Amino acid sequence: DVCDSLVEGRCIHNGCWCDEEAPHGNCCDTAGCTAWWWCPGTKFD
């Protein structure tokens, strides 16, 4: 698993992620969020 320290140290695999406070903005859509950016990796672990 690849953990991105820029995203509160949370593990991401497919870039599926949703957090307005993330440095990259709303990275992905896992529960209805708008994907503004794709986080590195391939899916939330």
UniProtKB/Swiss-Prot annotation:
Q: Does the keyword Disulfide bond apply?
A: yes
> Which pairs of Cys residues are joined through disulfide bonds in the record?
C3-C16, C11-C28, C18-C33, C27-C39
Q: Which residues carry this modification: 6'-bromotryptophan?
A: W17, W37, W38
Respond yes or no to whether keyword Disulfide bond is given for this record: yes
Expressed, tissue-wise, as follows: Expressed by the venom duct.
Entry-annotated residues carrying 4-hydroxyproline? P23, P40
The listed locations are:
Secreted
* Entry keyword set: Bromination, Disulfide bond, Gamma-carboxyglutamic acid, Hydroxylation, Ion channel impairing toxin, Neurotoxin, Secreted, Toxin
Q: Name one GO cellular component term.
A: extracellular region
Query: Which Gene Ontology molecular function entries are recorded, alphabetically?
Result: ion channel regulator activity; toxin activity
Residues with 4-carboxyglutamate modification: E21
Q: What does this protein do?
A: Mu-conotoxins block voltage-gated sodium channels. This toxin reversibly blocks voltage-gated sodium channel in cephalopods, with no alteration in the voltage dependence of sodium conductance or on the kinetics of inactivation.
Q: Could you give the domain comment from the record?
A: The cysteine framework is XII (C-C-C-C-CC-C-C).
> What's this protein's name?
Mu-conotoxin-like Cal 12.1.1c
Q: Identify the species of origin.
A: Californiconus californicus
